[in-house]
């Protein structure tokens, strides 16, 4: 297995060529999302929305720029595909489980994209803006009982992916023996 190499190659991509994913690439990424761990196996409480329609990507990009207070910003980075993860609104006590599930799905999709040589970046600001915009949420066909949790932008990267050295020192580790 080459899992650690894929992990070492995965990085946030903020510059895309504009080339759309092939159907096979998209299906591989969606398979990775569907292989993610989901709390209590409640896959019915999760939803993926694949956005490739340019006018909707532009609306989401503008909503994100407004959220950040910078109209010149392009928080989707020109990616031709954005996949939104949404979680069923199961109430405040369980909502965090859906957001954790979404994070696992995003990571699996990012690793699958890396394995395919595609660029990806985890998106939050545009998704927070989406969650606050009922009309845009409706345009994205996200049901009223689902909350946009996170998203991933995907596409052919303008910068080649480079393998990084992996370390155990970036994050504080406390060994309790």
For each of these PLM feature ranges, what is it?
Residues 1-81, 176-177:
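N-terminal amphipathic, basic helical "cap/leader" segment at the start of enzyme domains
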Residues 65-67, 99-101, 138, 168-170:
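Short, solvent-exposed amphipathic alpha-helical segments in soluble enzyme
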């Amino acid at each position: 297995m080459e899992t650690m190499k894929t992990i070492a190659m995965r990085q946030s991509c903020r510059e895309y060529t504009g080339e759309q994913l092939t159907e096979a690439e998209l299906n591989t990424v969606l398979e990775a999302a569907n292989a993610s761990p989901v709390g209590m196996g409640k896959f019915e409480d999760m939803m993926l929305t694949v956005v490739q329609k340019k006018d909707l990507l532009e609306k989401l990009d503008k909503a994100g720029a407004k959220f950040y207070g910078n109209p010149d910003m392009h928080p989707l980075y020109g990616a031709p595909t954005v996949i939104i993860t949404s979680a069923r609104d199961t109430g405040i006590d369980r909502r965090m489980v859906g957001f954790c599930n979404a994070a696992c799905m995003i990571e699996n999709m990012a690793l699958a994209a890396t394995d395919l040589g595609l660029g990806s970046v985890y998106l939050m600001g545009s998704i927070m803006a989406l969650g606050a915009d009922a009309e845009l949420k409706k345009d994205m066909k996200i049901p009223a009982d689902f909350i946009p949790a996170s998203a991933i932008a995907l596409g052919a990267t303008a910068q080649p992916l480079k393998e990084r050295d992996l370390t155990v020192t970036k994050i504080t580790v406390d060994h309790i023996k």
